[in-house]
């Protein structure tokens, strides 16, 4: 594999995010990198892809800046670019929690758990493992026994916690996310809310899966990633498929976006059922006048109507 995907973040003061973003974008484009980087006065949050040579130059460039001299990169091998374009954008936050009173993870955050310590927490009956990701991420893969918050946006997690305090009160709480950045701020919020014994998986699932001792043990399914790959393996010991196909409930790890551009819901669908149900999550979405699957495959009106009849077999998916 000639390409690599880098995942990283750091909470550090960046005085002029706009200027930094413009200069950073120029460097990335000059080195043929593609990805998404968010920059704020509170730090940087990025994931990008490129050849080994170009990503090495990027790592060297970042480490040469005193603000990022100790920056840790999580690295995956890849067969090609994992992104189509390169974006570097200034933002108010590098991960959107949208709290009324913002949390500074450099001042307040949960205890860091190493992969080995997190594995022990997974085995501890007195510890609650809380997934800090979205529901569709959890549904593709998660740590065994972890709590699944019913959210589609990270900013909704605090409200979910307040509505489900009985699951957490009086317990040791350890939270986890993809690379660790969401938990930095979220675990700090839990501490500020008065929860005691709050921890977080340092480096996230990505680090746990590559750890030579834990080897991703107790992870079921795949890890959702926000790039062209969609998902990656974590458990090196005992691989399982836990995702369920949207229409027939069979094991599935293939995510698509609903073909209705006004819905765009992410659903697990086999190639066969994507074709059968016109790339949509429901009858309402399949018959939408701007169905992207219909347009992309140049499906005739007659064939469109024929496939819409397939929804008679799945009445529970009449509406989005």
From Swiss-Prot:
Q: Name one GO biological process term.
A: tRNA modification
Q: Which SUPFAM superfamilies match?
A: Rhodanese/Cell cycle control phosphatase
Q: What exactly does this protein do?
A: Catalyzes oxygen-dependent 5-hydroxyuridine (ho5U) modification at position 34 in tRNAs.
GO MF annotation: an example: oxidoreductase activity, acting on paired donors, with incorporation or reduction of molecular oxygen
The enzyme's E.C. designation: 1.14.-.-
Catalytic activity line of the entry: uridine(34) in tRNA + AH2 + O2 = 5-hydroxyuridine(34) in tRNA + A + H2O
The family line of this record is: Belongs to the TrhO family.
**Pfam families recorded:** Rhodanese, Rhodanese_C, UPF0176_N
- The catalytic site is made up of 177 (cysteine persulfide intermediate)
**Which key words tag this protein in UniProt?**
Oxidoreductase, tRNA processing
Q: Which Gene3D superfamilies match?
A: 3.30.70.100, Rhodanese-like domain (3.40.250.10)
Q: What is this protein called?
A: tRNA uridine(34) hydroxylase
Report the residue ranges that make up the Rhodanese domain in this protein. 123-217
PROSITE patterns the UniProt entry points to: RHODANESE_3 (PS50206)
């Amino acid at each position: 594999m000639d390409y690599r995907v880098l995942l990283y973040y750091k909470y550090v003061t960046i005085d002029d995010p706009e200027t930094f973003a413009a200069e950073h974008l120029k460097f990335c484009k000059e080195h043929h990198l593609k990805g998404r980087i968010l920059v704020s006065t509170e730090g940087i949050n990025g994931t990008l892809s490129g050849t080994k040579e170009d990503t090495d130059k990027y790592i060297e460039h970042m480490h040469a800046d005193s603000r990022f001299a100790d920056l840790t990169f999580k690295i995956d091998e890849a067969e090609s670019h994992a992104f189509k374009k390169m974006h570097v954008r200034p933002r108010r936050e590098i991960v959107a929690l949208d709290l009324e009173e913002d949390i500074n993870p450099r001042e307040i955050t949960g205890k860091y758990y190493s992969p080995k310590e997190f594995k022990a927490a997974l085995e501890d009956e007195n510890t609650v493992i809380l997934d800090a990701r979205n529901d569709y991420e959890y549904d593709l893969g998660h740590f065994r026994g972890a709590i699944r918050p019913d959210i589609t946006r990270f900013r909704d997690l605090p409200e979910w916690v307040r509505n489900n305090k009985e699951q957490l009160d009086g317990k040791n709480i350890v939270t986890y996310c993809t690379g660790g950045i969401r938990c930095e701020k979220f675990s700090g919020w839990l501490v500020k809310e008065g929860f005691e014994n709050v921890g977080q998986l340092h480096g996230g699932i990505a680090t746990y899966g590559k750890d030579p001792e834990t080897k991703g043990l107790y992870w079921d399914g795949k890890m959702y990633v926000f790039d062209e790959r969609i998902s990656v393996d974590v458990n090196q010991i005992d691989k399982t498929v836990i995702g369920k196909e949207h229409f027939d409930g069979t094991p599935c790890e293939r995510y698509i976006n609903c073909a209705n551009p006004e819905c765009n819901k992410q659903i697990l669908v086999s190639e066969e059922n994507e074709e059968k149900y016109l790339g949509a999550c429901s009858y309402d979405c399949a018959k939408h006048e701007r169905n992207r699957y219909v347009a992309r495959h140049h499906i005739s009106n007659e064939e469109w109507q024929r496939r819409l009849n397939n929804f008679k077999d799945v009445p529970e998916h009449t509406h989005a």
